[in-house]
A protein has these predicted regions:
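Sec-dependent bacterial lipoprotein signal peptides
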Residues: 1-18
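Compositionally biased intrinsically disordered regions enriched in Thr/Gly
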Residues: 20-173
Length: 173
């Protein structure tokens, strides 16, 4: 009888420990695709966005935080805290205001273009976004840029190289 009580107690403690140990919610990625033209074909800006959104962001405060931070980076918005769709709408309004072409403006020789694409990957307890941009808004050539952002799935905060490597390892980089 003593052994049965002990076994039940151990099983209960194991079940309680398992119930209290929560794994972070794994993101399920979707794609927010936007193809639009601001202005006219002769005097306008073609916009192409491919944003890797977290479809299940509402399931975890960490995922909501990651989604909002990455939307801010992707759509180039400071201190943004809304949804990816809200970020896209805000970015399009901002671009339209910055590139307001008067009706009487002469036809451009090359139409303006802005293109951004994000890829996301989960590795262990981290999610990494790679944002690639290309734009032409006048001048001799377009501009390219690539950004990488890594977040903790458990806490939703962005990591830096100092969070991932020791001081000695950082000195060797």
């Amino acid at each position: 009888m003593k052994y049965i009580k002990t076994a039940i107690l151990i099983a209960g403690m194991a079940a309680a420990t398992a119930a209290c140990t929560r794994k972070p919610v794994v993101p399920q990625f979707g794609m927010l695709t936007i193809d639009t033209l601001i202005g006219t074909p002769a005097n306008g800006c073609k916009i192409e966005y491919r944003f890797a959104t977290i479809a299940n962001a509402e399931k975890s405060p960490a995922l909501r935080s990651i989604e909002a931070a990455n939307a801010g980076y992707f759509f180039e918005l400071e201190e943004f805290g809304g949804t990816a769709r809200q970020a896209a709408d805000s970015a399009l309004r901002q671009i339209a205001a910055e590139l307001a072409f008067p009706q009487s403006a002469p036809q451009m020789t090359e139409p303006y273009e802005i293109s951004a694409e994000a890829e996301a990957a989960v590795t262990d307890s981290l999610v990494t976004y790679i944002i690639s941009r290309w734009s032409y808004t006048g001048g001799a050539h377009g501009m390219y840029a690539t950004e990488c952002h890594t977040y903790s799935l458990a806490g939703g905060y962005e990591l830096s190289t100092a969070d991932l490597f020791s001081e000695r390892q950082l000195l060797g980089m």
